[in-house]
């Protein structure tokens, strides 16, 4: 590993520990030339995953896009930033386990909806309204019915 200050490639490991819930190894190193101490992380390299879009195009899987979309759905809820990142990490793990190299964007959307339904009902409704392109109140009502198992009369009295 190259020292960030003197560019020497000789260093010794002072300490190693598991990081990122076991997905990486954090190593504390010391340069043998200048004695500068620095930290490195070692992770398993994964194959890039292509997302097949509805229009037929492909793009590389981008975890940040999921964080952004889910963060919008979770605004003004009790879902913390850390919980969102943990949630996205779990979605990413499922994608890596379930797919070879390609996954449809619709599959990612359904994984997110399935997870949000368990985690936060408000975020689920918000995400579903964008993902499923709700056109009006009827779409919200039918989603609320499926979420709560309520009758139309009960929901109509609420609305």
UniProtKB/Swiss-Prot annotation:
Keywords of this entry: ATP-binding, DNA-binding, Metal-binding, Nucleotide-binding, Repressor, Transcription, Transcription regulation, Zinc, Zinc-finger
Obligatory cofactor(s): Zn(2+)
Record carries keyword RNA-binding: no
Biological-process GO terms, alphabetical: negative regulation of DNA-templated transcription
UniProt xrefs under InterPro entries: ATP-cone_dom, NrdR-like_N, RNR_NrdR-like
Chain ranges of the ATP-cone domain: 49-139
PROSITE patterns found in the cross-reference section: ATP_CONE
Pfam families: ATP-cone, Zn_ribbon_NrdR
Gene Ontology molecular function: ATP binding; DNA binding; zinc ion binding
Zinc fingers, unnamed class: 3-34
Cofactor remark from the record: Binds 1 zinc ion.
Protein family according to the UniProt entry: Belongs to the NrdR family.
PANTHER family from the UniProt entry: TRANSCRIPTIONAL REPRESSOR NRDR
Function summary: Negatively regulates transcription of bacterial ribonucleotide reductase nrd genes and operons by binding to NrdR-boxes.
HAMAP family, per the entry: NrdR
Protein name: Transcriptional repressor NrdR
Lineage per the UniProt record: Bacteria, Bacillati, Cyanobacteriota, Cyanophyceae, Synechococcales
Gene responsible for this protein: nrdR
């Amino acid at each position: 590993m190259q020292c960030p200050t003197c560019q020497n490639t000789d260093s010794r490991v002072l300490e190693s520990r598991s990081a990122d819930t076991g997905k990486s190894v954090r190593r504390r190193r010391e340069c043998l030339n200048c004695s500068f101490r620095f930290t490195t992380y070692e992770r398993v390299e994964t194959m890039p995953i292509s997302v097949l879009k509805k229009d037929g195009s492909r793009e590389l899987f981008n975890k940040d896009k999921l964080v952004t979309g889910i963060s919008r759905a979770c605004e003004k809820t009790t879902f913390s930033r850390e919980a969102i990142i943990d949630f996205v990490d779990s979605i990413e793990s499922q994608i890596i386990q379930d797919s070879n190299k390609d996954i449809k964007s619709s599959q990612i959307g359904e994984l997110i909806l399935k997870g949000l339904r368990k985690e936060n009902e408000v975020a689920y409704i918000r995400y579903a309204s964008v993902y499923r392109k709700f056109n009006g109140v009827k779409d919200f009502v039918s989603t609320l019915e499926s979420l709560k198992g309520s009758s139309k009369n009960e929901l109509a009295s609420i609305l």
